[in-house]
Every structure is written in structure tokens, then in C-alpha cells.
Regions:
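C-terminal cap of thioredoxin/glutaredoxin-like
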Residues: 241, 245-246, 251-253, 262, ...
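N-terminal export/targeting leaders of redox proteins
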Residues: 1-121, 163-167, 173, 183-193, ...
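Inter-heme linker and motif-flanking segments adjacent to c-type heme-binding CXXCH motifs
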Residues: 119-122, 145-147, 182-187, 205-218, ...
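The canonical Cys-X-X-Cys-His
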Residues: 130-143, 198, 235-254, 267, ...
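Electrostatic cytochrome c docking/interface patches
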Residues: 86-126, 207-239, 253-255
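Extracytoplasmic electron-transfer domains, predominantly the class I c-type cytochrome c fold
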Residues: 103-108, 112, 116, 137, ...
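N-terminal juxtadomain amphipathic helix
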Residues: 128-129, 149
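An extracellular/luminal cadherin ectodomain-centered signature
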Residues: 194-201
Length: 369
């Protein structure tokens, strides 16, 4: 405001001086003392114009003389899916449209998903909470790949009443389930910077998805049950021919050069997911593998048959891995999935059949009126 006042005062002073000079020239002309006709008329007019413009700029709201802004094209929703299509996560370039603080939080959340071990692993820079795997090892492409165990329906379906715990669970509780089971670690503080960042990322991914809606392509594809039990021996053959190049002959995975995390995760052993993880259920592991493994596979162009997929799942989940106390799981045992491998059950099928199948007879039992 101060510079505007200074300009107005300066223009007024100039106007006064010009009027004085014009009057002086007029007197000199009348007495014949001025040989040529001199007038300040045009200078005075120009100064008045400048004064009016300056006064208008000073009094009118800021931006009154600016050209009308051009409205940007409306941004499509973050969620990119249609009823007849598949959900996939948005391009992170869209984060630039958010305020700086929220953008930074979401980007940090995404980085925690892709490089979990660097922050929370055995040598993590923030804490030492997990087994060295990354969330992205199971939730592909930072949880955005169709049928890649993605996060597309997390925000729309939580809080969620889950049969496994028998409780209404928040997003934070679901994240910590993965921390304690898939990453075989300990829970994050639910109000920590890291948890808030992960939740913000999941909320952003779920933008535009209606509450309680589950778009096609979210989570893991459901495969039809085999009419036989899945066979670990056949699965070993599949593993040897299709999986060893990335996961190693002993399923140990491949570490990054700096030893901070896994490029390809261990499929069993002390650094793999424990027996409480979702992928320890054969249907979950098989559906995940079918659409995504080996490298280069997609849901449209799988490289394994359904039988190979079920068998390799049986082989991997027959190998040793960390245990977990599951006594608090499935308080209503009638709600256990058909492929939950630990009793007790309300049916009479064995734990072995619940683990490897055939599953159709078990499913039929629970469908009886």
C-alpha cells in the first residue's frame, strides 16, 4: 500500500508544478516576453490520466485490471476405472495439484510402501520393525496394479467388520495386520508420521470410489477350485522351471546390492511372511500368482495354467516359515475360509484338506441351508 501512496503524492506534485508553469508561460505570453508559444496543456492532461489510473489501481481490489483467468480443464478422478473395466491407480504426477503438505505426506506414504525395509526393516532409518521385505513385494506397483493385491478398495471398504478378528477394524489396524503377519514384524504406532503417511496414500488411491464399492480388478483374482488336491510335488517342478531365476533355489529371494531390502522377496524361511499372512491361504496365493507371476505375466496374459498355479502355491506354502499365535483369530469358527489350514472347524474335514483341497466339498458343506 505504501508504494501506491508515494506514487499518488508524486503525481499530485507533478500536476501542481505543471499548472504553475502553465500559468507562468501564459503571463509571459501576454506581456510579449515569450518568443514562442509554450503550453503545459498536454503534459497536464497526460499527468491527469496517470493520476486517475494510479488512483484506480490504488482503490480497486487487487487484480481488478487482470485478465480473466483461464480455468484449467477439470481433473479426472484419481481412481481410473469404469463399471466394465478394471481399477488401476492414478499417476503420481497428479499429486502436484494438491497442497504441498498433503502431497509430501502422500509421497512419503508411497515410498514407505515401495521401500518399506529402508525405513522400517532390520537396518531401517526410522525403526527396526519388519523382516526386510517391502509392502510392494506383495502389493505390486505400490498397490496399484490390477489384480496385483492392490489397495483400490481399501478406503471405500474400511472401517470393516472382519471375521478374522471379529471386530470392526480401521485402516490403521489393517495396515498393522500386514506389519505383523506379511512382514513378520511389530505394529506401527497408529498416530506415527509413517502410519499417517501410509493411510494418506491409501485414501488418495481411493478417491472417487463410492463407499462400500469394490471395483473390478481390486485385490486378488478368484480362481476356480481344482477337482483334486493341490500337489506340492508338482508345484516343486513348476517352481524349479519358472520361479528359481528370481526367488532362488531355496526360495531365499534376492537382496539389493546395498543389502537394505529385497529385489525379489523370499518365499519361505525366516525372512518371509508368517503363517498368519493372507498369502498362506492357498486360494489367495494361487490367485495372486495366476495374474502376476512369473515376471511379465498379467491377468490378460498369464504364463501358468490354473493347475500349475494351485500346485506351485501348495509347494511354496508347504515350506517352513515363521509361526504366529493365531488363538485370537476367527472367534466364530464357522466363518473360517475353506482354505484356512488350522482347526478347529465346525465341519469334519481335516486340516490337510483345508490346506491343500479339494476345496469344493468344503465349500458345498457351508452352502447347505
Amino acid at each position: 500500500m505504501l508504494p501506491g501512496i508515494v506514487v499518488l503524492i508524486a503525481l499530485l506534485l507533478v500536476l501542481v508544478v505543471l499548472h504553475v508553469l502553465d500559468d507562468a508561460f501564459k503571463v509571459l505570453r501576454e506581456h510579449g516576453d515569450l518568443p514562442i508559444k509554450v503550453s503545459m496543456r498536454w503534459s497536464i492532461r497526460a499527468t491527469w490520466i496517470l493520476l486517475v489510473l494510479a488512483l484506480g489501481q490504488f482503490l480497486l481490489p487487487e487484480g481488478a485490471f487482470d485478465a480473466d483467468p483461464v480455468s484449467p480443464a477439470p481433473l479426472p478422478q484419481v481412481a481410473t476405472y469404469a463399471e466394465d473395466g478394471l481399477w488401476s491407480g492414478a499417476d503420481t504426477a497428479r499429486l502436484a495439484y494438491l497442497d504441498d503438505e498433503l502431497e509430501a505426506r502422500i509421497r512419503y506414504g508411497r515410498e514407505l510402501i515401495t521401500r518399506t525395509a529402508a525405513f522400517l526393516g532390520p537396518n531401517g532409518s526410522v525403526a527396526h520393525l519388519t523382516n526386510g521385505m517391502n509392502c510392494q513385494n506383495c502389493h505390486l506397483d505400490a498397490g496399484t496394479r490390477p489384480w496385483g493385491n492392490n489397495y483400490g478398495a481399501v478406503w471405500s471398504t474400511y472401517p470393516n467388520m472382519r471375521s478374522r478378528s471379529g471386530k470392526l477394524e480401521s485402516v490403521e489396524k489393517r495396515v498393522n495386520d500386514c506389519m505383523e503377519r506379511s512382514l513378520n514384524g511389530v505394529a506401527l504406532d497408529s498416530v506415527s508420521k509413517e502410519m499417517r503417511a501410509i493411510v494418506a496414500y491409501m485414501e488418495w488411491l481411493g478417491t472417487g470410489i463410492a463407499k462400500d464399492s469394490v471395483p473390478k480388478g481390486t485385490g486378488i483374482e478368484r480362481l476356480a477350485f481344482l477337482d483334486r488336491a493341490a500337489d506340492p510335488a508338482r508345484g516343486h517342478e513348476v517352481f524349479t522351471s519358472k520361479c528359481v531365476s528370481c526367488h532362488g533355489p531355496q526360495g531365499e529371494g534376492v537382496m539389493s546390492k546395498d543389502g537394505a531390502t529385497y529385489l525379489y522377496p523370499p518365499l519361505w524361511g525366516e525372512h518371509s511372511y508368517n503363517q498368519g499372512a493372507g498369502l498362506f491361504r492357498l486360494s489367495r496365493f494361487a490367485g495372486y500368482v495366476k495374474a502376476n507371476m512369473p515376471q511379465g505375466s498379467t491377468y490378460e496374459h498369464p504364463q501358468l495354467s490354473d493347475e500349475e498355479t494351485w500346485d506351485v502355491a501348495a509347494f511354496v506354502n508347504s515350506q517352513p516359515r515363521p509361526t504366529k499365535d493365531l488363538t485370537g483369530d476367527w472367534p466364530d469358527i464357522s466363518k473360517k475360509p475353506v482354505d484356512h489350514p488350522f482347526g478347529p472347524y465346525v465341519d469334519t474335514f481335516t486340516e490337510t484338506q483345508h490346506k491343500y483341497g479339494p476345496f469344493a466339498p468344503i465349500a458345498a458343506f457351508y452352502k447347505k441351508p
